[in-house]
Amino acid sequence: MKLMGLDVGSRTVGVAISDAFGWTAQGVEIIRINEDAEEFGIDRVAELVEELDAGGFVLGLPKNMNNTLGPRAEAAQHYGELLTARFHLPVDFEDERLTTVEAERMLVEEANTSRKKRKKVIDKLAASLILQNYLDRHGKLTQE
């Protein structure tokens, strides 16, 4: 079963997909959203679920460094509730502390990417890292 990884922010959602075996994750795209206007990009997610044959979701859960949940983690959980209501597919969460920092480091140090280009791909790369970390630990969706 392919899993869709999502890095949910206040303005964008980075999207990644696993291979059918649950071994690797690759970035797909970045969906523009507007939390304030309650535009969450769910219709585009629906198109991608169908197009990519996703059977479940893994969302990044941005915990605080002391392991507590703050406003961004609550927003991610709310997004998970929206996905569950719309798709009736399993949703699980992966601790995403520092994944965006890691993505930024990879783009600067390893790919020597310009700041303008980084802004265009960082959320997609973060979604890939979140999903890959999940796959490396679990190999499959644990919340079925």
From Swiss-Prot:
Keyword Hydrolase: yes
Superkingdom per UniProt: Bacteria
Disulfide bonds: none
Name this polypeptide is given: Putative pre-16S rRNA nuclease
Keywords: Cytoplasm, Hydrolase, Nuclease, Ribosome biogenesis
Predominant cellular place of this UniProt entry's protein: cytoplasm
Recorded family membership: Belongs to the YqgF nuclease family.
EC number in record: 3.1.-.-
Compartments where found: Cytoplasm
Family annotation (InterPro entries): RNaseH-like_sf (IPR012337), YqgF (IPR005227), YqgF/RNaseH-like_dom (IPR006641), YqgF/RNaseH-like_dom_sf (IPR037027)
Molecular function, one GO term: nuclease activity
Swiss-Prot/TrEMBL GO biological process terms: rRNA 5'-end processing
Presence of keyword Zinc-finger: no
GO cellular component, one term: cytosol
One Pfam assignment: RuvX
Enzyme class: hydrolase
Function: Could be a nuclease involved in processing of the 5'-end of pre-16S rRNA.
Organism: Lactiplantibacillus plantarum (strain ATCC BAA-793 / NCIMB 8826 / WCFS1) (Lactobacillus plantarum)
